Amino acid sequence: MRAGSLDITRVSVGRSPDGRLRASITMAQAWSPRDLLGRDGAPPGSICLRVWLGNHRPSSTPPDDLVCMTVAADNDRLKASVQRERPNDLPERVADATATKPTARTATLRFAQSALGRPASFRFGIEARKGGCRRLDCLDTAPDAPRSGRVSLR
């Protein structure tokens, strides 16, 4: 992985006490929302929970849904949303999500289970890309692709 990239060291996905789904992502080093800025026309960075529903497998199909965070307009906070993947088109925003940064190394996504259609379980992967990077060596995944985690909700 490229120096200065977002290096994922720990991921936890499950249900919060308030009933929402929660993904907590910890990086190897401290980072800030400004690290997701795309400067001078470069693309912004993001941290995304990739979700596969039903029998879809991460090794053979694109994710069904993305829950992504990126830098907010004030450049100091994070914003997030749930997006549904569409064949041959850009993802469609389907629900709100929240993103917080409780520590210097960790960010947390929260969203309603109904945003995914209330599945009994799903497979997931996390990907993180620092702002301004178009290269694959800037992308980190957890678990390491093509592996995935699994969450049972019922």
Language-model-detected regions and their locations in the chain:
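Ser/Thr- (and often Asn-) enriched beta-sheet segments in non-cytosolic proteins
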Residues: 7-12, 22-26, 106-110, 121, ...
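Extracellular structured ligand-interaction cores
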Residues: 18-20, 44-48, 97, 104-108, ...
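A short, polar/proline- and glycine-enriched secondary-structure boundary/capping micro-motif
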Residues: 33-37, 92-93, 119-122
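Surface-exposed, glycine/proline- and aromatic-rich loop segments on solvent-exposed faces
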Residues: 1-77, 131-135
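Short, low-complexity, Pro/Ser/Thr/Gly-rich segments in the mature regions of secreted, periplasmic
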Residues: 142-154
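Acidic, glycine-rich flexible loop segments
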Residues: 79-119
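Ser/Thr/Pro-rich, low-complexity mucin-like regions
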Residues: 102-145
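A broadly tuned preference for mixed-charge, low-complexity surface segments
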Residues: 23, 74-89, 153-154
